[in-house]
Amino acid sequence: LVGTQMIAKGLDFPNVTLVGLIDADKSLHVEDFRAAERTFQLIVQVSGRAGRGDRAGEVIIQTSTPHAPPIQFARKSDFEGFQLEELEQRREFNYPPFRHLIRHLFRGRNPEKVNFYIEQWAKVLEQAMGDSIEIRGPAVAPIEKIRDEYRFQLWYFAPSASQVIQRIVSLREDFKMDRDVFDQIDVDPMQLS
């Protein structure tokens, strides 16, 4: 059986006795605080494809970081241990669920114009809310261009998303941009790209 990550998603192959996972740690090296969680989930899910029938299964994992916690916890199917380790890491760096992460994406066909508006917005926000939230950016989004639109982003960290969003929406209503520049806000986004 040869496949992509798709084979991890709930398919039942009762005669599969060997599963190999190539570059299992590749997802660990992306700019996303959930990278360890996604890596752990993928390994556990793919491992679950082997040995579903009457015959025992075996899993071979290729990794360049065999001692990484997600790899080791997945190797032992230690869900509780992984959860405790991951929560401790997130507490240490103050990532969700310990505070909210809000992504503010600006996009448009003219990169200079998009960059101009996101920089102006960052100044407005810093002046109005700099004491109540942590602002990171602006920066080019990890996927810089989609469908001929350039993308830039800001990140906001806050203890309460609802209060911050209300204030941001209020400020945003008074912030004028050209019609060909768009923005969107995502609270605790699942994807950071």
Where do the model's predicted regions map?
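Accessory helical-bundle/CTD segments and flexible terminal tails appended to RecA-like ATPase motors
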Residues: 1-31, 45-193
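Short, conserved loop/turn and helix-capping segments at secondary-structure boundaries
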Residues: 33-40
